Curated annotation (Swiss-Prot):
This is Large ribosomal subunit protein uL10. It holds the Pfam family Ribosomal_L10. Forms part of the ribosomal stalk, playing a central role in the interaction of the ribosome with GTP-bound translation factors. Gene3D superfamilies: 3.30.70.1730, 6.10.250.290. InterPro entries: Ribosomal_uL10 (IPR001790), Ribosomal_uL10-like_sf (IPR043141), Ribosomal_uL10_bac (IPR022973), Ribosomal_uL10_bac_type (IPR047865), Ribosomal_uL10_CS_bac (IPR002363). Keywords: Ribonucleoprotein, Ribosomal protein, RNA-binding, rRNA-binding. GO terms for biological process: translation. Part of the ribosomal stalk of the 50S ribosomal subunit. The N-terminus interacts with L11 and the large rRNA to form the base of the stalk. The C-terminus forms an elongated spine to which L12 dimers bind in a sequential fashion forming a multimeric L10(L12)X complex. GO terms for cellular component: large ribosomal subunit. Belongs to the universal ribosomal protein uL10 family. The lineage of its organism: Bacteria, Thermotogati, Thermotogota, Thermotogae, Thermotogales. One of its GO terms (molecular function) is large ribosomal subunit rRNA binding.
Length: 181
């Protein structure tokens, strides 16, 4: 059991981590073996490197750290119960972490249960995890935006090129007519 100074130190560390986090997901890890927790950590590390961490935290300390970081914890008090592990992402794509976690839950037949999460500081209930896992990744979104911007420009270029081709064909036709005369 941690002593008060150690708890204060932990809250300070978590507060600084949560202030820079794009995702804070809390889950009930009951029913997971150490090997399964290690596999989840490994999968997160493979996808996000050192930008994602999964750690077990006491609910009161977790709530303090989230409050200190500016998260709206009071409205979602019911999400903080029982044994809790927290997954947070400080760098990298938070949607990738959600996908890794969701796939892990599917592989382990619904364990662990997501209690709730903050994605870009907006709260989502644990039941929304599947929907969030279907979101496109950051890179896919950027590609979609670039494609959306590029399509009208490409269409304009093709239209202008078509007009220029028509003028060129007309000029060539006039040139050929004059050469025949």
């Amino acid at each position: 059991m941690l002593r008060r100074p150690e708890k204060e130190q932990l809250v300070q560390e978590l507060t600084s981590e949560f202030q820079n986090s794009s995702l804070v997901l809390f889950t009930d890890f009951k029913g997971l073996t150490v090997a399964q927790m290690t596999n989840l950590r490994r999968a997160l590390r493979e996808k996000l490197g050192s930008g994602a961490r999964l750690t077990v935290v006491k609910n009161t300390l977790l709530k303090m750290a989230l409050k200190n970081s500016g998260y709206d914890v009071d409205s979602h008090e019911s999400s903080f119960f029982g044994p809790t592990a927290v997954l947070y992402v400080t760098e990298g794509d938070p949607v990738e972490a959600i996908k890794v976690f969701y796939n892990f839950v599917k592989e382990n037949k619904g364990t662990p249960v997501c209690k709730g999460l903050f994605l870009e500081r907006k709260f989502f209930a644990g039941e929304q995890l599947e929907d969030l896992s279907k979101l496109p990744s950051r890179d896919q979104l950027i590609a979609m935006v670039v494609g959306g911007i590029q399509a009208p420009i490409r269409g304009l270029v093709n239209s202008l090129a078509g007009v220029l081709r028509s003028v060129l064909y007309a000029l060539n036709a006039i040139k050929e007519q004059k050469e025949k005369q």
